[in-house]
Swiss-Prot record:
Record keywords, A-Z: Annexin, Receptor, Repeat
PANTHER family: ANNEXIN, ANNEXIN A9
Record's keyword annotation contains Zinc: no
Subunit structure: Homodimer.
Pfam families, sorted: Annexin
Transmembrane regions: none
Gene Ontology molecular function terms on file: calcium ion binding; calcium-dependent phospholipid binding; phosphatidylserine binding
Protein name: Annexin A9
Similarity comment: Belongs to the annexin family.
SMART domains: ANX (SM00335)
The organism's taxonomic lineage, starting at the top: Eukaryota, Metazoa, Chordata, Craniata, Vertebrata
Species: Bos taurus (Bovine)
Annexin repeat placement: 41-112, 113-184, 197-266, 270-341
Protein role: May act as a low affinity receptor for acetylcholine.
Gene: ANXA9
PROSITE patterns membership: ANNEXIN_1, ANNEXIN_2
Length: 345
């Protein structure tokens, strides 16, 4: 289809320039994560070091963190298996017995398979924490389709209920509809073909969906279209109306529904910036939100934490590493700094 111009379309040059941010460029070793596969990996040597760290009178926390924060998640799982084969004991339980507090929590998160950690966080968000529009949406909206499928399968196995059933019972209104649609994983795949007519149709549909009983349109567009298409819709909406879609959301919705839609728009526009904002918010609380810090740093350490660091530094004028140093105390700080990896000057 032809490229449109004027208010409803972005030029080809604008399209290209919008994708040139350094925060989105893969690092020299082929990943935007801070944590890579440890090349000199030996599960047996790591097991020996961990056994030594917990066998004496005092627990060697530095040694434990040095091993766990310098191995990929797959390598940590291999260490757990090797530990069990050698000792007939569970590594996770052994470390839990030796540690306590936030350090214990971060070690548990490091040793759990990603899907198990996501399932646990999703369950906590839906059952009693009042954070469905925040944590539940984070997990459902930012995981890849295979990651989401595995998370939901683990959720059903561990808690004997479908996540969809908990969403239905614990949320309501457009928030419930958004979470259910995201949990179905029905978002269209990006084909590489730009459909400018569909983008224009979606912009018009959202403009006309500002009255009552139009929530279904918002859910459909936000949860079914592929992210690349949605970025174009958000840009064209602003081009056409003179204001961002977020302004319309704030005027049209309230409470959890408003927060959920704003969060989803943030994920669509710039996922690393979305996580940078969440990390900054977690650090600004009177007591740092350790659960949020742990969840985000661990879950993004092998995917895009370098991009998140770049967005954090650009927006807040201070590196994520320095912010963690200033706000977090104790052994937990050492673990989070190890995942963050380095200062951004």
């Amino acid at each position: 289809m032809s490229v449109t111009h004027g208010k409803m379309g972005l030029s080809l040059t604008q399209e290209i320039l919008s994708h040139l941010g350094l925060a989105n460029k893969t690092a020299a070793w082929g990943t935007l994560g801070t944590l890579r596969t440890f090349l000199s990996f030996s599960a047996d040597k790591d097991v020996q070091r961990l056994l030594k760290a917990i066998a004496g009178q005092g627990v060697d926390r530095i040694a434990i963190l040095d091993v766990l924060t310098n191995r990929s998640r797959e390598q940590r799982q291999l260490i757990s298996r090797a530990f069990h084969e050698r000792t007939q004991q569970d590594l996770l339980k052994s470390l839990q017995a030796a540690l306590s507090g936030n350090l214990e929590r971060i070690v548990v998160a490091l040793l759990q398979p990603a899907a198990h950690l996501d399932a646990r966080e999703l369950r906590t968000a839906l059952k009693g924490s009042g954070s469905a529009e925040d944590v539940a949406l984070e997990i459902l909206a930012t995981r890849t389709p295979p990651q989401l499928q595995e998370c939901l399968a683990v959720y059903k196995h561990n808690f004997q209920v479908d996540a969809a059933e908990d969403i239905k019972s614990e949320t309501r209104g457009i928030l419930r509809d958004l979470l259910l649609a995201l949990a179905k994983g029905g978002r269209e795949a990006y084909t590489g073909i730009i459909d400018y007519n569909l983008a224009a149709q979606d912009v018009q549909a959202l403009k006309q969906a500002e009255g009552p009983s139009t929530e279904r349109t918002w859910v459909l567009v936000f949860t079914q279209r592929n992210p690349e298409h949605l970025v174009r819709v958000l840009n064209q909406y602003q081009w056409y109306t003179g204001h961002g879609l977020e302004k319309t959301v704030r005027a049209r919705f309230h409470g959890a529904a408003c927060v959920a839609l704003l969060n989803l728009a943030s994920v669509i526009r710039n996922t690393p910036l979305y996580f940078a904002d969440k990390l900054h918010q977690a650090l600004q609380e009177t007591e740092p939100n350790y659960q949020a810090l742990m969840r985000i740093l661990i879950s993004r350490s092998e995917t895009d934490l370098l991009s998140i660091r770049a967005e954090f530094r650009k927006k807040f004028g201070k590196s994520l590493y320095s912010s963690l140093q200033d706000a977090v105390k104790g052994d937990c700080r050492s673990a989070l700094l190890a995942l963050c990896r380095a200062e951004d000057l």
